[in-house]
Amino acid sequence: MAPAYDFKIWRENNVLIAIICGSWSKLSAQDFANEFKQAAAPLTGQPWAHIVYMDDWNLGVPEIEPVVQELVTWCINNNLRYAAQVHCPNMVKRYQMDRMVIEKSDGFERRIFPEQQAAFAWLASLGFHTKHTNFSHQAG
């Protein structure tokens, strides 16, 4: 049986891009965190950014929260400067993400966008350019 979650992670220049889907358990969050750190490792010597598409993410159990919080701490301690989260307005999704990911600190800022093009444009305006300006080439 296929897992109830899925994700894709890849790099474009100094931006780590992810698509997350499904309902997440602690194990799925751990799988994501491990793969995320491996993909981000080449970027950590300089400032980098992250963008994630989460319209198809169906939230996670409360046990994912410490896993994601630790990942966020690792990212910020390893030069992550900006994070763009892309999803249609959803108060429950926003509530869970706000519990796991800080919005702003010295040297870090997270923003939420309802449209992917605006998220990519925000990162580009900060000097974090990607080859693509949407997720469609990796969807499916």
Can you annotate each of these PLM segments?
Residues 1-140:
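Amphipathic, Lys/Arg-enriched alpha-helical "gate/interface" segment within cytosolic domains
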